[in-house]
Amino acid sequence: MVVLRPKITLTSVRGRIQVTAEDGERVGPWGGTECFLSRQTGQGPCLVVRSSRHKRHQGTFFRLEGVRQVLSLYAMEGKLTVVVPHQKRLCSVFIETFADVDALQMMAATLQDRSRWKDIEKNVACRVQRITRTNVVDTKRITNMDGGTDTHLDYKQFEWGGGEDDSCAVGGVSCNPLEGARGERNGDGVESILQERPTGLPSAHSGGKLPKHMGGDELNPQLEGSTTPGRMQWTTDQIVATRLVCTGSNVFITGSAGTGKTEWLLHLVRNVLPRDDRTVVTASTGMSARLLGGCTIHSFAGIGRGEGGFNRVYNRVKSKPEVVRAWRQCQTLIIDEIGNISPDTFSMIDEIARSLRGAPEKPFGGIQVILLGDFLQLPPVDSPKARNEWTNGNDTDTDSNPIPGKLKWCFETATWESLKLALVGFRKSYRQMNDPDFALCLEDIRFGRYTRRVERILNECSTRQIKERHGIEPTLIVARRDEATEYNAERLKMLEDVHFHRYESEDYAAIPGMNLEKEVSLQQLLELRIGAQVVLLASLPDAPHLSNGDQGVVVSFAEQTRGPALPVVCFATSGGEEVLVPRVSMEVLGPEGRVIATRTQIPLQLSWAITVHRAQGMTLPLVSVRLNKCFFDCGQAYVALSRVRSREDLMLTAFDPSAIFADARAVAFYEKNFPAQRQSVEDTECELVPIKGKTRAKHPRSQGEKNSVDEGGNAPEEHPLRTDAAFTAYHDLDSQVSTDMPLVPQPPRKKRMLVEELPQVTSSAIPNFTQESNNGDANSQLQHPFSQNNLMVDDD
């Protein structure tokens, strides 16, 4: 078993420390994995940063006498930035920790109060402090050199990679991606893990089992956006997924809404994988990236909006040394919400990784890739501009619809095939665990099946009138943004209180021309009145139990000694608790974590109505849905209906069964690769109900298979995929699927795609390290290299 490396200095803060110069250059040798305060002889008070390459008396000494600014807004979340000069350069020292948050807050308080600098301990960097690994494992009470004791120093709790020799143990298996069993990806190693029935979730804490102070085999994650109630028991699927990651395998994690994918990923990032530049956490949306503490995949890859074709994009990426350095240091790449990434973008990122890392024959240049998402939820959305830029005149018909052969999903690409992913599906529903019949109903809807169970439950919801709770009305989920905006404006005018409060945001952008509307979810202008129904867009420092997606009603406004009055909101999710909502700041980070923009604003938004794209990932207390043809794309009905915990919280004001449909190729992918998720055909509740005026394909066929004979008069040859047993069972289940595109994906190309052959990437790029934002007009890439469009476009 590998034991975690102890602190070099007992009073230090362990974490990820990055140093960035004023011109944006990252100074790697000045960063490290732990820092502390010390009054050094001849230098005065200093912030000392160390890494594994330093000896006990060495480090980078930032003299505090010239400190310019201490940004401690997110100190409670383990983040602190200190702006201080060093060697004639103005530097930003960014400190991030999950293990020593309390110590970081104490450090922030000391840095902000110069009167306390005289109390900083002297010459800490010169003191000899010997702690053996045996001491770390066997005791939590360690005697220091002054004869006193330091208690509750559990150095096993978190692993921070500080050098090439850092690694963590999970069930006795190395969790260093490059040291893992790469050769087992397609062999008996992965197969044996998939067939095992493990009993505990491996972690870096104790080589296979969570420590008792974290709940043993259970986890109580107080996470922003958490969908799981109370304490969470890890399932066999989640344990298998963790073990696969720790063997170095490429893994795809999927599952229905509310099956704990986010909670599992947060545990993986915080407690299992190395926490340094070797592990990169990304997501396709800004909201998901912010929740995970990472950046968007477009920001990390450096592709921006991807305009101009591969050659131009690749040349821009090569011109950014921080992006090239990040690609070459990366050993494990996590991409959340993979279903929202277009296949063109996915292939382009793969080709960039191969080229920058000098490994053209290895997928993603040899990086371990961990993908999460659900292809049966919202599909990728390409803007018209991106679609026109990609097409050459042969990819669209006269109605601007994609031709049948056009790829739609990442799993249809040659890149997906080359990764040889181990597939794991999470099956246990935490969100609807108290209403299992409703969970089965949602699973039918997810696959586009209008069954007797779906008909019965949705008919109940269509006749139900839900009363408000703590003043909260059911949130109307719509498909288009303009519909939500219009509805919210009408409801705001209907309030009796004529007095309103307007809040304008305070914006900062390091890059001229940056449009923050596309980067953060905070609104530039917010108008509130007493009685307004709102949704929280960010966690609050004084109310950590509240998180993004919590709803409430504005009940009053509290006057402040400085600045405008702040809204007081009664939140339904906290039992009617009234909370003062202050201004918060959202930061936009570049590929290496450097802050390039901020917006400070009240983190609220009117929520009588929200779009289905905004609702994705949320758990809402009450929901109202007009289930009709306004839901125009596959997966939209499923996402809207699955936001609640039980059928009692759902009300349908319109009900058209034809709005329930799934993408044929996505359904075929899941039926082929996850046959265990099929329901028993003997269950009468699974019988399909005919829909008047709607044609369902019992055997979803591609466009080329619609005719029974070909031009030569011969019957079309059956595709090999249809001979699979799992797919045969899918025929029997039937499904209401969208057959506008071929069911069977194109076979992967054997030849690796050349740079000249790779098509242009779509402009469906994402805001980085922010909450999901609305989409607006695109700025020039030359003006703003980090600005991206939002992939999840929810307007016409």
Curated annotation (Swiss-Prot):
<keyword id="KW-0234">DNA repair</keyword>
<comment type="subunit">
    <text>Monomer.</text>
</comment>
<dbReference type="GO" id="GO:0031981">
    <property type="term" value="C:nuclear lumen"/>
</dbReference>
<dbReference type="InterPro" id="IPR051055">
    <property type="entry name" value="PIF1_helicase"/>
</dbReference>
<feature type="DNA-binding region">
    <location>
        <begin position="636"/>
        <end position="655"/>
    </location>
</feature>
<dbReference type="InterPro" id="IPR003593">
    <property type="entry name" value="AAA+_ATPase"/>
</dbReference>
<keyword id="KW-0233">DNA recombination</keyword>
<keyword id="KW-0238">DNA-binding</keyword>
<keyword id="KW-0539">Nucleus</keyword>
<dbReference type="GO" id="GO:0003677">
    <property type="term" value="F:DNA binding"/>
</dbReference>
<dbReference type="GO" id="GO:0006281">
    <property type="term" value="P:DNA repair"/>
</dbReference>
<dbReference type="GO" id="GO:0000287">
    <property type="term" value="F:magnesium ion binding"/>
</dbReference>
<dbReference type="GO" id="GO:0005737">
    <property type="term" value="C:cytoplasm"/>
</dbReference>
<dbReference type="GO" id="GO:0006310">
    <property type="term" value="P:DNA recombination"/>
</dbReference>
<dbReference type="Pfam" id="PF05970">
    <property type="entry name" value="PIF1"/>
</dbReference>
<feature type="region of interest" description="Disordered">
    <location>
        <begin position="762"/>
        <end position="796"/>
    </location>
</feature>
<comment type="similarity">
    <text>Belongs to the helicase family. PIF1 subfamily.</text>
</comment>
<dbReference type="GO" id="GO:0005524">
    <property type="term" value="F:ATP binding"/>
</dbReference>
<dbReference type="InterPro" id="IPR027417">
    <property type="entry name" value="P-loop_NTPase"/>
</dbReference>
<keyword id="KW-0227">DNA damage</keyword>
<keyword id="KW-0413">Isomerase</keyword>
<protein>
    <recommendedName>
        <fullName>ATP-dependent DNA helicase PIF6</fullName>
        <ecNumber>5.6.2.3</ecNumber>
    </recommendedName>
</protein>
<comment type="function">
    <text>DNA-dependent ATPase and 5'-3' DNA helicase required for the maintenance of genome stability.</text>
</comment>
<keyword id="KW-0547">Nucleotide-binding</keyword>
<dbReference type="InterPro" id="IPR010285">
    <property type="entry name" value="DNA_helicase_pif1-like_DEAD"/>
</dbReference>
<dbReference type="GO" id="GO:0000723">
    <property type="term" value="P:telomere maintenance"/>
</dbReference>
<feature type="region of interest" description="Disordered">
    <location>
        <begin position="197"/>
        <end position="230"/>
    </location>
</feature>
<feature type="binding site">
    <location>
        <begin position="255"/>
        <end position="262"/>
    </location>
    <ligand>
        <name>ATP</name>
    </ligand>
</feature>
<feature type="region of interest" description="Disordered">
    <location>
        <begin position="692"/>
        <end position="719"/>
    </location>
</feature>
<dbReference type="GO" id="GO:0005739">
    <property type="term" value="C:mitochondrion"/>
</dbReference>
<dbReference type="GO" id="GO:0016887">
    <property type="term" value="F:ATP hydrolysis activity"/>
</dbReference>
<dbReference type="GO" id="GO:0043139">
    <property type="term" value="F:5'-3' DNA helicase activity"/>
</dbReference>
<keyword id="KW-0378">Hydrolase</keyword>
<dbReference type="GO" id="GO:0005634">
    <property type="term" value="C:nucleus"/>
</dbReference>
<keyword id="KW-0347">Helicase</keyword>
<keyword id="KW-0067">ATP-binding</keyword>
<dbReference type="GO" id="GO:0051276">
    <property type="term" value="P:chromosome organization"/>
</dbReference>
